[in-house]
Regions:
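Acidic/His- and Gly-rich active-site-bordering loop/insert found
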Residues: 1-108
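Active-site alpha-helical elements of protease catalytic centers
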Residues: 107-122
Length: 122
């Protein structure tokens, strides 16, 4: 597991991109998120959804604070669509390379970068 390193969203985004979480396979992305959020004091539950004839799909439910009063929900997904023909990529789609100040990789904008922002803002 990669440590949070003060919640740096760049570090978190790169760590999530490096998980080859092509639908429906998780490749450790959910566990990585659970680890980070647990370190921050969240109670985390990893839920396994099963349906006959399909691959299992993991989901994460994380909660902090008491159950009284208003709640704020961050919702997202860690899976990405297949990268297609890798020869058409200028870099490894799961290497999370930083080029000219931009992070390049599967899920950088949909939606691993946003999830890293949720976590770092918490």
């Amino acid at each position: 597991m990669i440590n949070i390193e003060n919640g740096d969203p760049i570090v978190l985004t790169k760590a999530l991109i490096s998980c080859r979480s092509v639908t429906p396979h998780n490749d450790g992305a959910i566990e990585q998120l659970s680890h980070w959020l647990s370190e921050m004091g969240f109670k985390c539950d990893i839920l396994n959804f099963k349906e006959d004839g399909t691959d299992d799909v993991l989901n994460l439910w994380a909660r902090i604070g008491n159950e009284e009063g208003p709640a704020l929900c961050f919702a997202g997904h860690t899976d990405v669509v297949p990268e297609g023909d890798e020869t058409r990529w200028s870099t490894d789609p799961f290497a999370a390379n930083e080029i000219d100040g931009k992070i390049i990789g599967r899920g950088a904008t949909d939606m691993k970068g946003a999830i890293a922002s949720f976590v770092s803002a918490t």
